[in-house]
Each structure stands twice: as C-alpha cells, then as structure tokens.
C-alpha cells in the first residue's frame, strides 16, 4: 500500500460547458491541497500574469473571497471595457457563488475549504451580451465542473465511445472525417 504524504495528493480536475451562444460558460477547474501541486500552480499563476490575462481571487463581495480560495483565470483577454466588466462582474460573481454552492452541497468538504486551493479557467465570450445569463451559466458551470472532478468524470467508456463523433459548440467535423474507424 502506498501512502501519499499530506498535500501531495493528486489534484481533482473538472470541466463543464453550460449554455449556448455568446453567453455560454466553459470552465476548467483544478482543486488540490495548498501545500501540493495545485497550491504551487495557484501561487505561480497569481504571481506571473501575462498581458491580457491577470488572474485574481474570486470574491463573493469586496474583501470576502470565496473558500476554498479560488483563482479566476481568464481564457480570453478583455476585448473592450464591456467585455472586461462581464469578466469582473457577472462571471466572477457566478464563479464565487458556484464554489460556495459546491461547499454548501458537500462536494467540497468544509475542512477542504480552508486547506485547498481552486484554479478556475473561465471563458467569457467577447461578444457576450447578457450579464444575468453569464452569471447563471458560470455559477452552474463551476459547481458542475467541481462535481465532475470529484467524481473523476468523464467515464473512460464515454470518452472512447465519443471518439468517432467529436463535436463542440464551435465545430463538428463532417461524418466522413469524424469517424476514422481506426481501432487503436
């Protein structure tokens, strides 16, 4: 039996896409102990912003960060002031509320809320135009992404079953290209 030292457990990785069109939310999460790889990644990302991508701590309101401390990392640089406001406003509020929902539901334990760190990579479309929908979609997406990470989803059977017909909201290959029928 192999015992993993405290803080060196494997981080939970989750993903979820909620909504459609320009107000959809796509979130990726990494949750792990602050003293482990997730904590190192969290601190490194906060300390090393890049042009247009400035990670920040998600707050429920000013000076009240959500727990576990959540680093909001944008997947797209703010295209203009209105896009930036959607990132900093409704998307951040949705992420913070969704993380708190995950703690309230027990998906993240109360103990882990003080010992773990969460990284949330968040997509807000530069053409998004409905603040309330951005909020709702991000709240649901992060809560579901955290639950998916806790459940080690997706199931490998589902991944292998979908490999012949990949698609996403931005592209679906033609049937003759999607299914290569290579059985490797």
Segments from the language model and where they lie:
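Accessory interaction regions appended to the cores of large information-processing enzymes
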Residues: 1-184
């Amino acid at each position: 039996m192999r015992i993993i030292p405290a803080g060196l457990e494997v981080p939970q990785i989750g993903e979820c896409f909620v909504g459609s069109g320009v107000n959809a939310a796509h979130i990726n999460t990494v949750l792990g102990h602050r003293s482990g790889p997730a904590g190192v990644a969290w601190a490194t990302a906060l300390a090393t912003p890049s042009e247009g991508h400035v990670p920040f701590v998600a707050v429920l309101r000013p000076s009240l960060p959500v727990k576990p401390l959540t680093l909001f990392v944008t997947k797209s640089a703010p295209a203009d002031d209105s896009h930036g406001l959607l990132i900093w406003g409704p998307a951040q509020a949705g992420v913070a509320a969704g993380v708190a929902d995950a703690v309230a539901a027990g998906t993240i334990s109360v103990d882990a809320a003080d010992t773990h760190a969460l990284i949330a990579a968040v997509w807000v479309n530069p053409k998004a135009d409905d603040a309330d929908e951005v909020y709702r979609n991000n709240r649901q997406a992060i809560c579901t992404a955290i639950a998916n990470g806790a459940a080690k989803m997706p199931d490998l059977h589902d991944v292998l079953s979908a490999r012949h017909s990949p698609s996403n909201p931005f592209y679906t290959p033609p049937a003759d290209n999607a299914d290569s029928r290579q059985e490797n």
